Amino acid sequence: MSELIMYILATAVVSIGVGIVAGKAIFQKDFSKQETEAKEKANLIIKEAELKAEATKKDKQLEAKEHFLKLKTEFEEDSNKKKNLIIQNEQKIKQREQTISKQMETNTRREAELDSLRENLSSQLEILNKRKEELEKLRHSQIEKLEKIAGLTGEEAKAQLMDTIKEEARTEASSYIKRITDEAKMTATKDAKKIVIETLQRTATENAVENCVSIFNIESDDIKGKIIGREGRNIRALEAATGVEIIVDDTPEAIIISGFDPVRREVARLSLHRLVQDGRIHPARIEEVVTKTAKHLDEEIIEIGERTAIDLGIHGLHPELIRLVGRMRFRSSYGQNLLQHSREVAKLCATMASELGLNAKVAKRAGLLHDIGKVYPDEPELPHAILGMELAKKYKESAEICNAIGAHHDEIEMTGLISPIVQVCDAISGARPGARREVMEQYIKRLKDLEQLALSFDGVLKCYAIQAGRELRIMVDAENVSDDKAGILSFDIAQKIEKEMQYPGQIKVTVIREMRAVNFAK
C-alpha cells in the first residue's frame, strides 16, 4: 500500500516537473515573440516620429522663411517711404533756402533804395527849410509894409476883420434861423394835426361808464328770505364778509349790490350766485364761500392780466405787473373802466409812435402801464403817476417807460420822446364825450379816504364804507379792543371824521367786536 502511494507520488512529481519544463519552454518562446514584435513596433513608431519631426521642421523652416521675407518686404517699403519723405523734406528745405535767399536779396535792394531815398529827403528838407526861412522873411517884410500903409498893426487889422465877419455871420444866421423856425412851426402844427387825426381814425373805442351798483338776478322772490336769514343774520354776515351793502327791496327777481369797490362787488355777486346754487345759506357757509370766491377772483385777475398782455402783444412783464393790469378790470377812473382806458391808451400810443417813426412796442407798453399806480393795494400817499413809476422801476422796466409813466401828469420832467406821446394819448382817451364822470371819481375818493381814516386807528382790522358813505362799519380785534374801548373808538373816529372830512348829512360809525371760541371734538 505504501509502495503504491509512493509510486503515485513519484509519478505526480515527475509529471509536475515535466509540466514545469514544458511550460517554461513555451513561455520563453512566447516572450521572445512578443519582444520581437514590440521592438518592431518601437522601431516603426520611432521612424514615424522621425518622419513627422522632419516634416514639422520643414514647415517651421518655411514659415520662418515666409515671415522673414514679409518682414524684409515691410522693412524695405518703410525704408523707401522714409527715403521719399527725406527727399521731399530736402526739396522743401532747398526751396525755402532759395526763397530766403531771394528775400534777403530783395531786402538788401530795398535797404539800398531806402538809403538813397533818405539822402534825397534830407536834401529836399534842407531846401524846404531854406525856402521857408526866405518866405517868412518876405512875409514879415510885407506885413511891415502893409502896417505902414494902413496905419494899423497886424493884430488890430485881424481883430477888425474878425468883427466884420462875425457881424455878417450873425446877421445871416439870425435870418436863417428865423426862416427855419417859421417853417418848422408851420410843418409841426400841420403834421401834429395829421398824426392825431390819423390816430383817432384808426382807434375804435367804446363809450363805457362804470357805476357803483351791481344787480344780482334771482329766479324767484322766495330766495330773498333765505338770503336775509333769521332776523337778518345772513345778510349781515354777507355784508361783513364782503364789505358791500346788500339791498333786498321790492324790486322783482333782483338783489342790488352797492359798493364803490368793484372787486368787493364782484366777490359779493359771485358768492351770492354760489350760495343760491348750493342752497345752504348760513353765516359759517357764507364766510367759507366768500373766502373761496375771493381766492378764485384773484386767480381770474391774473388770467385777465395775462390775456390783456397777449392781446396787445406785450411780453416779458413781471408777474406782479400782470396782477396789477388784471386789477384794472375792477377799477374805474372818473367812471371810465381803467383796463379799457389803459388798453385804449396803449393802442393810441402804438399808432402815434409808428406815425412818428418811434418804437411802437415801447410806446404800447408804457401806455398799458401808465395808470398801474391807481390799482396798487397799499395806496401810499403818493400821486398815482409817481407810484406807478416806482413800481415800474421795482420790476425792472426800462428808464424810458418809467419816465413816461411818471411824467404823464407832469409830476416829473419828461426825458424821452415816448413820454409826451403817453400824455397826449391819455388825454385823448379821457377827453372823449361821455368817457368820464368827475363826480363819480370824487365820490369814490371820498369813500376811500373815509375807510383809510378808520384804518389808521389801532385795533381796526377791516373797515367798509356802505350806503353811499352814510355808514362806516368797522371790524376790530376782540383781543386788543374791549367792549368799553369799542364805544370810545367809535366816538374818536366820528370826531376825527368831523374835523378832517367834508360830507353832506351825517355818517353812522358802527364798531363791530366779535369774539369767537373754537374747539374740535376728536
Curated annotation (Swiss-Prot):
Pfam families membership: HD, KH_1, RNase_Y_N
Keyword Transferase: no
Membrane-traversing stretches: 3-23
Single GO molecular function: RNA binding
UniProt keyword annotation of Cell membrane present: yes
Location of the KH domain: 212-272
SMART domains, per database record: HDc, KH
Top-rank EC class of the record's enzyme: hydrolase
Main localization, broad class: membrane
The enzyme's E.C. designation: 3.1.-.-
GO BP term (any one): mRNA catabolic process
One GO CC annotation: plasma membrane
Subcellular location: Cell membrane
Membrane-topology annotation of the record: Single-pass membrane protein
Protein keywords: Cell membrane, Endonuclease, Hydrolase, Membrane, Nuclease, RNA-binding, Transmembrane, Transmembrane helix
HD domain sequence ranges: 338-431
PANTHER family (UniProt xref): RIBONUCLEASE Y (PTHR12826:SF15)
Record function comment: Endoribonuclease that initiates mRNA decay.
Family: Belongs to the RNase Y family.
NCBIfam families attached to this UniProt entry: HDIG, RNase_Y
Name listed for the protein in its UniProt record: Ribonuclease Y
Species of origin: Cytophaga hutchinsonii (strain ATCC 33406 / DSM 1761 / CIP 103989 / NBRC 15051 / NCIMB 9469 / D465)
Chain's gene name: rny
